[in-house]
């Protein structure tokens, strides 16, 4: 588990939606890496898009490469070759501009990464011409991981969003963390996004560090839809803060792309944003989220 920030001797960590990468029984990697048909449902793409950065050129390369998802699934090889050629062109066009915008201590490692990306793109061109789907997918993942790593170099030095003072007593995660989840059926790895849900993610990682979830059973399972856990043994239905002897509640957090601030304890209906998609959409396979009651949005615990 990675710890990011602390304040007033309390570990500040969090969550509202987190993306899981599941490795049960170590399946064949190329099969696990097959991209989904829609980038909005690809957890890795969502995490890249959710970074609070504005690096238009690098993100253009990312999005162009992600466009190959539908093409590779449909076996549209001529279009795939053309898209890879466009990626190569964008890389050559933007490389010096992107490196120039980086902090000085990141420039040399970025230059090396760009050389590796060029090799990846050359390999993708070869794989598309050979109609080698599995090699294409594997190399594509390597390239996107490198692009995501470059994007992280552009993260701001300070947390970019305000959190209301009324939640000062709650743990928060001002960044991202990795959490290992062990189950009787195998292990899972979760990437917890505190940029877009600092209080939810912070509470989740805080409870994880306290072993709150240890030995808790899965108390709800709906096939191909959802698994639920977190109901503690005894009468309590949530986490009881030992300092107050009361159930700790975490507010509902929603971030919407291009909105300046995070919304707290307001639903899309409350905001009148009926057609908007949150930065961290819940309809993605592998998403981890907290449930609240039918009567309140601020009783996550």
Regions found by a protein language model. Give the residues of each.
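…; additionally, a secondary subgroup of soluble metalloenzymes is captured
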Residues: 19-20
């Amino acid at each position: 588990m990675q710890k990011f920030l602390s304040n007033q001797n309390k570990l500040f960590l969090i969550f509202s939606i987190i993306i899981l990468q599941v490795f049960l029984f170590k399946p064949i990697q190329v099969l696990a890496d097959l991209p989904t048909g829609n980038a909005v449902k690809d957890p890795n793409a969502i995490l890249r898009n959710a970074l609070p950065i504005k690096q238009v050129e690098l993100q253009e390369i990312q999005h162009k490469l992600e466009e190959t998802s539908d093409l590779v699934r449909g076996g549209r090889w001529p279009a795939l070759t053309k898209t890879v050629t466009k990626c190569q062109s964008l890389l050559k066009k933007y490389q010096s501009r992107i490196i120039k915008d980086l902090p000085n201590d990141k420039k040399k490692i970025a230059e090396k990464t760009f050389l590796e990306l060029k090799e990846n793109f050359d390999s993708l061109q070869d794989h598309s011409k050979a109609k080698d789907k599995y090699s294409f997918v594997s190399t594509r993942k390597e390239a996107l991981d490198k692009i995501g790593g470059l994007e992280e170099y552009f993260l701001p030095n300070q947390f970019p969003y305000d959190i209301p003072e009324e939640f000062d007593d709650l743990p928060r995660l001002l960044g991202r963390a990795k959490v290992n989840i062990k189950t009787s059926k195998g292990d899972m790895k979760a990437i917890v996004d505190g940029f877009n849900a600092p209080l939810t993610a912070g509470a989740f990682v805080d409870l994880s560090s306290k072993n709150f979830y240890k030995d808790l059973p899965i108390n709800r399972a709906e096939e191909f839809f959802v698994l639920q856990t977190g109901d503690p043994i005894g009468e309590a239905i949530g986490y009881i803060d030992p300092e107050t002897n009361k159930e700790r509640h975490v507010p509902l957090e929603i971030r919407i792309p291009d909105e300046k601030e995070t919304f707290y304890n307001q639903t899309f209906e409350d905001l009148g944003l009926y057609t908007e998609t949150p930065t961290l959409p819940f309809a993605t396979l592998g998403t981890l989220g907290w449930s609240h009651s039918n009567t309140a949005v601020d009783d996550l615990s």
